[in-house]
Amino acid sequence: MKRSIEDTPVVFIGAGNLATNLAKALYYKGFRIVQVYSRTEESARALAEKVEADYTTDLQEISKDAKLYIVSLKDAAFVELLPQITEDKQKSLLVHTAGSIPMSVWEGHAERYGVFYPMQTFSKQREVDFQEVPFFIEAKRAEDTELLKAIASTLSEKVYEADSEQRKSLHLAAVFICNFTNHMYALAADLLEKYNLPFEVMLPLIDETARKVHELAPRDAQ
């Protein structure tokens, strides 16, 4: 009997905002999330309960039998833990979800590896509609590229291949659009609070500004 792609056993290494949203989305699509790792038991258990998986806070206890390992950690933690993450997983596919880290980080540590990058801002408290999230895929082997594209396609209609240089530019552009904008919102909120004005009066302006770039080039909408 031919196995479906959803039968692929998946381990999540990380239980933060992105990992939580992505693991839940794959779980809702029928994927088998077999284990969740996090440094903190509270985070590991919380996500594991949502996707009916085991959990651990010990890297040595991470299952060696999964077919796919999705690593979603802070950049510094990922680089620090890389040797332990990849130990005894030569036959498995390992991917990270970072826009800013090149695929070459895996070289010398894994045989099958890649990048599975959903470009969106995530929080644990708010579920994202993955149908609208663009995924950017890169893998060392062509067959793994196709596997990752197939997995992403179960979640989103917007799946692209992008190399590490392209993804770095995507990540930088996303920082300008999201992080810088949020910082400006915070400054505006502080100013309004100083004069006893509610931030909600800005929401129609924020919404219309965002809607404009769906129809006009950013420079034309200025």
Predicted features and spans:
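Rossmann-like NAD(P)(H) cofactor-binding subdomain of soluble oxidoreductases
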Residues: 41, 51-127
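NAD(P)+-binding Rossmann beta1-loop-alpha1 motif at the extreme N-terminus of oxidoreductases
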Residues: 1-56
